[in-house]
């Protein structure tokens, strides 16, 4: 397993909240990547900034990942999923595969993580990194904490450990494979819980949008809150 994939899996498998300094640096670095993406695959918008449109020109498979919602295991399983090599053969020149130039030595299957490293697939997530949808009872318990004035209670920490595992894993994927990994902005990429500039404050099982905002402010402060919002704005 490569160092890049190992690092990504480490973030996705974290069972504690990330440290302030680590999170700050990761947000700063991934925002720099997003701000400087190649206009060949991410054309400029009317404001002369990287827009939200992707122009994926390479004739390779595009794997579309649906809403993630605080499921780090979902991404881990995708990276480890083995695709039959025949799936790629019609769209990939054998010489692009490096060590598999001899067609007789082609593997039967390859993991998506390995294909991503070799730039043989695109992996495109359609957004919604945080706010678990599988734990309505947990959100009810978080609501009890929240309206008691506890914004970083143990139940909310459990929710946010999973959420930050996803967020950090996504950022590491983007840093590692900027050309072939893309994460689009969904309606849940709204850490400020704003209802301006095309965003809408989010509620489903509880007041999740405000609860997450207050958690980040309480645990990490306004600097991290701003950096997350800046990362979201650059998606």
Where does each model-flagged region fall?
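Feature recognizes metal-dependent phosphohydrolase scaffolds
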Residues: 1-235
């Amino acid at each position: 397993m490569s160092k890049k994939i190992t690092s990504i899996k480490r973030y996705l498998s974290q069972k504690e909240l990330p440290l302030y300094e680590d999170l700050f640096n990761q947000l700063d670095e991934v925002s720099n990547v997003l701000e400087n993406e190649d206009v060949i695959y991410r054309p400029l918008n009317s404001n002369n900034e990287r827009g939200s449109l992707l122009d994926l020109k390479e004739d390779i498979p595009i794997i579309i990942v649906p809403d993630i919602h605080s499921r780090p295991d979902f991404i881990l399983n995708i990276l480890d999923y083995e695709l039959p090599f025949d799936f790629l053969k019609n769209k990939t020149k054998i010489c692009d595969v490096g060590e598999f130039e001899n067609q007789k030595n082609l593997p039967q299957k390859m993991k998506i993580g390995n294909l991503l490293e070799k730039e043989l697939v695109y992996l495109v997530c359609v957004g919604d990194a945080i706010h678990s949808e599988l734990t309505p009872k947990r959100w009810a318990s978080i609501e009890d904490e929240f309206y008691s004035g506890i914004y970083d209670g143990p139940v909310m920490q459990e929710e946010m450990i999973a959420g930050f595992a996803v967020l950090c894993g996504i950022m590491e994927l983007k840093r590692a494979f900027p050309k072939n990994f893309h994460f689009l902005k969904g309606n849940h990429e709204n850490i400020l819980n704003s209802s301006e500039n095309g965003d809408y404050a989010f509620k489903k099982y509880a007041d999740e949008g405000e609860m997450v905002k207050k958690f980040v402010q309480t645990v990490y402060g306004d600097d991290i809150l701003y950096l997350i919002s800046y990362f979201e704005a650059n998606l």
